[in-house]
């Protein structure tokens, strides 16, 4: 039987804890129906016997205290409400235990913003990870030695797993159901909970808001210039001139501040503008393309699909109700 330890983090999202426990309970029930032994033993593990979660709205009582768990097979780090860095600091005392369990052979999985606490342990250094797309820039800034793949719904590498934004944790849980039981049971569980079992990409849900979580005012002004003039023919030399610095210095500072090249940033701004038009208007794909400054339909479609995870037409069909 797989011993599952759900961490009772301070400010944890209640649903992440409850849904995890409930899903494994349902899976055990399916197994018992077919005359098999339950596969998962689930416990809520905390540092204290009374934990405040969801911005102190609720109190939960862990089944067992951290110091009383010598070994577990799977550690679940739930998502946290509010500021991810503050939540990580609030729960930093879990980090040594998480690391020790991993070194003893346990798998460790983070949900949404829980990736910040997993990153804090140092276990993710040099490895892949995902989190909620809204935290992506902040995560990259504080953990540059981790390969963030924020377009992915889940990741799993060397016993370290993570899930993307909010409800992506359902796919993470199904991954463990399939791994420790069978594909057949994972499919049955997915149908029971009405989950798209093979959802792999959260790109269609990402909203690009600009990487402005930095202190370089000159680069912020350049970003604003791009966002106000994206429909025109922008080039790096032109934008550097508006900033009154050399192109080389501008490009270096831009990458340092935003984690994007200037060309990448321009593409992201253009595609975000296109997405908004496709969501709310009846304009054709070609009309939208011209409005954001593209002239080649194939190039536009390729760039759009690479960033949004689907074609412009598919994106419109997904979100537009006009």
For each feature predicted by the language model, list its residue ranges.
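Basic/polar phosphate-binding segments, predominantly the helix-turn-helix DNA-binding elements
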Residues: 225-227, 233-269, 289-314
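N-terminal functional module of multi-domain proteins
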Residues: 2-119
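A short, Lys/Arg-enriched amphipathic alpha-helix from helix-turn-helix/homeodomain DNA-binding modules
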Residues: 207-234, 241-243, 264-283
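Short active-site oxyanion
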Residues: 103-108, 123-128, 159
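Basic, amphipathic alpha-helical hairpins
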Residues: 178-182, 202, 221-235, 254, ...
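Conserved anion/nucleotide-ligand pocket segment
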Residues: 151-192
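Accessory alpha-helical/coil subdomains and C-terminal extensions
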Residues: 180-224
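A conserved active-site-flanking secondary-structure segment within enzyme catalytic domains
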Residues: 125-153
């Amino acid at each position: 039987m797989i011993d599952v330890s759900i961490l009772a983090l301070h400010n944890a999202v209640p649903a992440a804890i409850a849904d995890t426990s409930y899903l494994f309970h349902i899976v055990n029930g399916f197994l018992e129906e077919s005359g098999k032994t339950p596969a998962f033993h689930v416990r809520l593990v905390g540092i204290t016997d009374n934990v405040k979660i969801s911005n102190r709205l609720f109190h939960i009582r862990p089944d067992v205290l951290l110091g009383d768990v010598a070994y577990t097979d799977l550690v679940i780090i739930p998502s946290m409400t509010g500021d991810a860095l503050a939540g990580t600091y609030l729960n930093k005392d879990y980090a040594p235990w998480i690391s020790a369990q991993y070194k003893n052979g346990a798998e460790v999985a983070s949900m949404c913003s829980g990736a910040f606490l997993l990153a804090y342990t140092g276990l993710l250094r040099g490895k892949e990870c995902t989190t909620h797309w809204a935290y992506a820039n902040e995560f990259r800034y504080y953990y540059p030695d981790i390969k963030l793949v924020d377009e992915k719904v889940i990741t799993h590498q060397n016993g370290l797993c993570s899930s993307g934004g909010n409800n992506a944790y359902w796919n993470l849980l199904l991954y463990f159901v399939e791994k420790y039981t069978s594909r057949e049971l994972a499919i049955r569980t997915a149908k029971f909970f009405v989950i798209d079992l093979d959802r792999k990409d959260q790109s269609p849900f990402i909203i690009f808001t600009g990487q402005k979580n930095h202190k370089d005012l000159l680069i912020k002004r350049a970003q604003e210039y791009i966002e106000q003039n994206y429909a025109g023919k922008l080039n790096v030399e032109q934008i550097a001139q508006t900033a009154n610095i050399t192109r080389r210095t501008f490009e270096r500072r831009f990458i340092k501040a935003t984690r994007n090249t200037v060309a990448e940033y321009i593409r992201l701004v253009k595609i975000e503008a296109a997405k908004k038009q496709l969501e709310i208007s009846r304009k054709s794909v070609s009309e939208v393309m011209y409005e954001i400054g593209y002239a080649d339909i194939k190039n536009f479609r390729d760039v759009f699909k690479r960033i949004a995870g689907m074609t412009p037409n598919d994106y419109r069909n997904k979100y537009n109700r006009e």
